[in-house]
């Protein structure tokens, strides 16, 4: 019996159900940004669910939407637990995932550099013992 994978399986189902609930929308007027559930983790005892969310919009929209999500956590916990038929309802904790915003910012900077005719410089150092590009061609 492989019970050690159960938290990962429950976390994935939790993420899926929560995404579906958020897609249907919540009645909280603060939730105006587009919310994406980027991941979830479940504690080994299935009592804590950490859900990573990305919110598209300006800073104010992100803050208001995140506050609305936190306020709706109890409702979302109950609805997800009811859908998954869990014996115990995991405590839901939202964490803002900056990776999507960071990726968008990097993409925007690269696009701007290309339109200005600049190629982004590689910050990668050559491996020890490797010849520089101009010596390698000789």
UniProtKB/Swiss-Prot annotation:
Gene3D superfamilies linked: 3.30.300.20
InterPro entries for the chain: KH_dom-like_a/b, RbfA, RbfA_dom_sf, Ribosome-bd_factorA_CS
Signal peptide range in chain numbering: none
GO MF annotation terms: ribosomal small subunit binding
Keywords: Cytoplasm, Ribosome biogenesis
Main location: cytoplasm
UniProt-listed SUPFAM superfamilies: Ribosome-binding factor A, RbfA
Disordered as annotated region, ranges: 112-138
Pfam families from the UniProt entry: RBFA (PF02033)
Record-level GO cellular component terms: cytosol
GO biological process, one term: maturation of SSU-rRNA
Subcellular localization(s) per the UniProt record: Cytoplasm
Record flagged with keyword Transferase: no
Summary of subunit composition and partner proteins: Monomer. Binds 30S ribosomal subunits, but not 50S ribosomal subunits or 70S ribosomes.
Family that this chain belongs to: Belongs to the RbfA family.
Physiological role: One of several proteins that assist in the late maturation steps of the functional core of the 30S ribosomal subunit. Associates with free 30S ribosomal subunits (but not with 30S subunits that are part of 70S ribosomes or polysomes). Required for efficient processing of 16S rRNA. May interact with the 5'-terminal helix region of 16S rRNA.
NCBIfam families: rbfA
HAMAP family, A to Z: RbfA
Protein's recorded name: Ribosome-binding factor A
């Amino acid at each position: 019996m492989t019970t050690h994978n159960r938290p990962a399986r429950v976390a994935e189902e939790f993420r899926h159900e929560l995404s579906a609930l958020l897609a249907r929308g919540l009645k909280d007027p603060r939730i105006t940004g587009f919310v994406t559930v980027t991941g979830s983790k479940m504690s080994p005892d299935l009592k804590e669910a950490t859900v990573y969310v990305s919110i598209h919009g300006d800073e104010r929209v992100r803050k208001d939407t995140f506050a609305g999500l936190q306020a709706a956590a109890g409702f979302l916990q109950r609805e997800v637990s009811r859908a998954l038929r869990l014996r115990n309802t995991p405590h839901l904790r939202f964490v803002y995932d900056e990776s999507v915003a960071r990726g968008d910012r990097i993409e925007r900077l690269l696009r701007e550099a290309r339109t200005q005719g600049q190629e982004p410089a590689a910050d990668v150092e050559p491996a020890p013992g490797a010849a520089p590009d101009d010596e390698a061609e000789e």
